[in-house]
């Protein structure tokens, strides 16, 4: 793996925590800062010391972000991507903690959009901004940042150049209104894995919901013999309330080293934060169910249902609690079928509701193909979505070459778990304009969106009945670039061949 597993300390959070903790423990990694729930499930005395890697579920529950030192991140990512062939991984362009030079390109109501380039030896002590008069940052930018006005004490105008730090990065498939890779700020932070130093901050802040624990921890920190860099204060997270005095001191010393490096404008490469984003496909979510099931009662489709949102997640917790823990003599879950009917009737989508077709790409980004109405629903997992083509109409339908006109309909039939779906295009008068069959990762029907990742190769059926397989070259290019694993590409090619034969009959 390129690194010693015993030197990698991983903290895991979110809906995938139990399965990923089990997977990493089996691969001989050290888990630290475990939550009370994880401690109870594994009955292990996990250490509360600083981490070198964090694994955190994304806000949309679709995957995880892995952040920390480069060698450790790569090592952990390799282990977790092996959970399923439809787990896809991409580099995080803006991992938290990385410092950039930014130029404001657009001001909005509550924040500004900025172009980001890597900062070279930022002068953070003097507060002077870099002299980049000869550089047009938007042309050289590696990413886009969103700077909330309440994350800076500066007056922001379009064209301003400043030093910023990534405070929270977003996965490439994220579809927020900010259109940014990260939320950034002008306040600099030095994360030590258990404690964080904040430039311009005073005293000690404890980020915990327990006031008594906060007071006790603040008192412990006052007992530690450390020299803080001038102008930096301390913030510690909730996990630190369970840490020993020795562990606290170690975490603070690590944060101090990073703060001094930031102040000197020379952050050491071995401690610079890097990141990988992992998106779990449906097949991978079910593989994670199996891993979790070896630890605790887990219904079929546990992670698939939880990925639908907080309400669905709470429903899963209730169902599993009622079924009881493994081996305790209570009622157990017997069936191994995903309860599509129950899940969609409870949370959606069902007939008459509107959903988006959310089209992921192997390069990491994703976009909506548009909203449509669910015009048919079946308990076997099939959903029909009808979209009306509006506007003046221009151009042609992708690959089909037939005119795209206002009044056309696009009828898409998807089935939960299937590796493909057809869309039939018809004119206002019902004339067939062609059928486009998209080959993709197993489809998931979430309450507000149908989701998958497109695998490039497709099969089309023209109005005259001719069948053609298209975009094999794009699939091959994606494999060469490392965007699609070979095993996933083989599956896509196999599905394409089967569909081509079936449609040509």
From Swiss-Prot:
Q: Which Gene3D superfamilies match?
A: FomD-like
| Annotated keywords | Endonuclease, Hydrolase, Nuclease, RNA-binding, rRNA processing
Q: Which cysteines are joined by disulfide bonds?
A: none
Name of the coding gene: fau-1
Q: Which family does it belong to?
A: Belongs to the FAU-1 family.
Quote one Gene Ontology molecular function term.
mRNA 3'-UTR AU-rich region binding
**For the region Disordered, what residue ranges are annotated?**
389-408
**Pfam families named among the record's database cross-references:** DUF402
Q: What is this protein called?
A: Probable ribonuclease FAU-1
Report the protein's function.
Answer: Probable RNase involved in rRNA stability through maturation and/or degradation of precursor rRNAs. Binds to RNA in loop regions with AU-rich sequences.
Native species of this protein?
Haloquadratum walsbyi (strain DSM 16790 / HBSQ001)
Q: What is its EC number?
A: 3.1.26.-
Query: Top EC class per UniProt?
Result: hydrolase
